[in-house]
């Protein structure tokens, strides 16, 4: 059982206090329903060696270390491998380098300098395995709640969290839709790599706005195309082999959508073409990756002949 009482205590006296009261029952109900692989992943978590980190670095990456022998490291590696595939990272855990599919540290180095998270209550929507949650704490956030309904990501978060039990980061296996309307309790809300999977993009923006306090900041990172405010790509079928991609707006179009959704002070702080060095197959994620989804003769296009992945980060104020 995962005990959420520290989260409830943390949220006492905040606008999120009443929401927090029902979280334990909501989580227990989700765990009761479970997932077919949950027992196997729990076995991997139980196989992790009991270690106490003497070094913790969440500022320059995600690194935990202490004195431990090769046998303990081998045990650590085997247990973590049992939670593959690892998508977001990398993690350096007691001498084991988890070389994830994504170099998420590169994205954080592009996004992080534009943010002031000091003392902020943060929500990370579609948080994956929680890599960015730890980096947000490293950037001074007061606390970070992540929501993502993927059970493997939930277990990967637990693998790191069991070595950092005192830190104010929580991963809830919920979708954004599981959060109540008009929550209005977070200073900063992140939606990174989620927007293009949504069939109703404006509804997603409104739901994110609902989570923010008045004057709070949205950090929106998503796939975009080049063009003016009237340019939006809706793939006929797949995009980079993904079926569930709906809307790829231009940056000016996305900025307009944010303003229509009631946000102000909208600004784009980064646009980057995703490279095959930033997203690739590794020992920790052995399935196909970006190089398999691009035209082998022209990396400016996907295998479907559409513009290759280009990602933008926009900030906006409620």
From Swiss-Prot:
Family annotation (InterPro entries): CmoB, Mo5U34_MeTrfas-like, SAM-dependent_MTases_sf
GO molecular function, one term: methyltransferase activity
Catalytic activity: carboxy-S-adenosyl-L-methionine + 5-hydroxyuridine(34) in tRNA = 5-carboxymethoxyuridine(34) in tRNA + S-adenosyl-L-homocysteine + H(+)
Chain positions recorded as carboxy-S-adenosyl-L-methionine binding sites: 88, 102, 107, 126, 176-177, 192, 196, 311
Keyword terms of this UniProt record: Transferase, tRNA processing
Stored HAMAP family: tRNA_carboxymethyltr_CmoB
Protein name: tRNA U34 carboxymethyltransferase
Organism: Pseudomonas putida (strain ATCC 700007 / DSM 6899 / JCM 31910 / BCRC 17059 / LMG 24140 / F1)
């Amino acid at each position: 059982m995962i005990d959420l009482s520290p989260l409830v205590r943390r949220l006492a006296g905040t606008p999120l206090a009443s929401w927090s009261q029902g979280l334990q029952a909501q989580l227990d109900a989700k765990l009761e329903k479970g997932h077919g692989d949950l027992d196997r992943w729990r076995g991997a978590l139980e196989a992790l060696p009991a270690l106490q980190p003497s070094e913790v670095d969440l500022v320059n990456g995600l690194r935990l270390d202490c004195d431990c022998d090769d046998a303990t490291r081998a045990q650590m590696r085997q247990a973590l491998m049992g939670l593959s595939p690892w998508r977001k990272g990398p993690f350096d855990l007691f001498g084991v380098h988890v070389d994830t599919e994504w170099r998420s540290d590169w994205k954080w180095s592009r996004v992080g300098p534009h943010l002031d998270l000091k003392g902020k209550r943060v929500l990370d929507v579609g948080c994956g395995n929680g890599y960015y949650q730890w980096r947000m704490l490293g950037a001074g956030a007061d606390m970070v709640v992540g929501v993502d309904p993927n059970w493997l990501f939930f277990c990967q978060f637990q693998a790191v969290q069991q070595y950092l039990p005192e830190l104010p980061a929580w991963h809830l296996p919920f979708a954004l839709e599981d959060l109540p309307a008009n929550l209005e309790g977070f200073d900063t809300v992140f939606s990174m790599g989620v927007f293009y999977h949504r069939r109703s993009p404006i509804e997603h923006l409104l739901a994110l706005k609902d989570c923010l306090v008045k004057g709070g900041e949205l950090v929106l990172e998503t796939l975009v195309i080049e063009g003016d405010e009237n340019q939006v790509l809706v793939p006929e079928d797949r995009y980079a082999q993904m079926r569930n991609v709906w809307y790829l707006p231009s940056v000016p179009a996305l900025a307009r959508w944010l303003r229509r959704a009631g946000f102000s002070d909208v600004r784009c702080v980064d646009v980057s073409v995703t490279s095959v060095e930033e997203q690739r197959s590794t020992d920790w994620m052995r399935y196909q990756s970006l190089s398999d989804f691009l035209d082998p003769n022209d990396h400016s296009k996907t295998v479907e002949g559409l513009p290759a992945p280009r990602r933008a980060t926009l900030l906006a104020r409620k």
